[in-house]
């Protein structure tokens, strides 16, 4: 999994079969590896489009069932601020088109570092939006049922 490049922000599915992380090669991009046996992982693979783009993707969080990813993406045309949090649903073996979480998670400020609760009902993230205590603060949003 490790290379001469920077790898960070690891995340596992609850069954420990899929390992997601960020690799920085110029811009940040998302990679994954699958578990072969108790001590071996497959070579890492780039998640590719539509998740990774020519822009900057930052940090990734995977739902416990492995069906959703939440991630930071910066400077996208549908963004509300410089960096926003997006999600994508796994359709079979292909990740769907990413969707911006919009307000109340995203704002005109910077949002990043998503971390999804185990039950998938809350997302914790960092933002420098107005109303916090300092430069960057930790925020939480509770998702409504079926949204």
What name fits each language-model region?
Residues 1-147:
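Short, conserved micro-motifs composed of acidic
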């Amino acid at each position: 999994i490790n290379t001469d490049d920077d790898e960070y922000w690891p995340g596992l599915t609850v069954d420990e079969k899929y390992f997601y992380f960020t690799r920085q090669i110029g811009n940040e991009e998302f990679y994954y590896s699958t578990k072969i046996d108790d001590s071996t992982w497959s070579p890492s693979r780039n998640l590719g489009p539509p998740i990774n783009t020519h822009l900057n993707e930052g940090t990734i969080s995977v739902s416990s069932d492995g069906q959703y990813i939440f991630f930071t993406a910066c400077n996208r045309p549908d963004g509300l601020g410089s960096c926003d949090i997006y999600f994508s649903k796994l359709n079979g073996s292909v990740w769907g088109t990413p969707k911006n979480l919009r307000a109340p998670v995203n704002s005109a400020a910077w949002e990043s570092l998503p971390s999804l609760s185990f039950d998938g009902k809350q997302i914790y993230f960092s933002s420098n939006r107005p109303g916090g205590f300092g430069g960057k603060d930790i925020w939480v949003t509770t998702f409504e049922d079926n949204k």
